[in-house]
Structures are given as C-alpha cells and as structure tokens.
C-alpha cells in the first residue's frame, strides 16, 4: 500500500465520522490537525520517559500510527504531496552536513 492509498483510507474514515462536515464538533482544520499531530507525538515520548526502550511496543505502534494518520490528513487538506515532499527532503538531506560531535 502506498501513501495515497493510506491517505484515501484515512479520508474515508474521517468522512464516515462526519468530521469533514461544516458543523463537526471536530473541525478538521490545518491548525487543529497540527495541534493533534503534536499531541500524539508527545504521547510517543511517554513510552520512553525514564526508560531506554518502550515498555509496550503494541501501544507504541498505535501512537506511531496516530501520528502518521494526522500527518497524512494534514498534508491532504493543505494540498501537499507528502510522497514528493519526503523524496525531496531526502535529496536535501543527502547534501546536508551535520556537525559531528
């Protein structure tokens, strides 16, 4: 399955819940999705608080999936081709030099 197929499935779910409706109590705006993305990313950190390895990889997988879904949705509603953006960023990073510590 590719990024577009995942995005389509995510959009189907959001539509089926009515979250794209104008009167939705969960308006799917770029701002709200960015906030949700950050909150879900913070939940990933909880799995590593005071430990080097996640204590429950199944729960961690769910949090990673939440982050990915919000990222796909944010890219979708802002008209960003996430696959292209990722490939472009990889090319930029190939040429980038990071400080060696």
What are these regions (language model features)?
Residues 1-64, 68-101:
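Flexible "arm" and connector segments at domain edges
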């Amino acid at each position: 399955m590719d990024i577009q197929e995942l995005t389509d499935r995510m959009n189907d779910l959001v539509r089926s819940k009515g979250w794209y409706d104008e009167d939705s109590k969960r308006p799917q705006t770029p701002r709200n999705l960015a906030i949700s993305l950050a909150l879900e990313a913070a939940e990933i950190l909880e799995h590593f608080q005071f430990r080097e390895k996640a204590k429950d990889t199944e729960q961690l997988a769910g949090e990673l999936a939440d982050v990915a879904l919000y990222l796909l949705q944010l890219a979708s509603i802002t008209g960003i081709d996430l696959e292209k953006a990722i490939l472009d960023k990889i090319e930029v990073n190939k040429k980038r030099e990071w400080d060696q510590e």
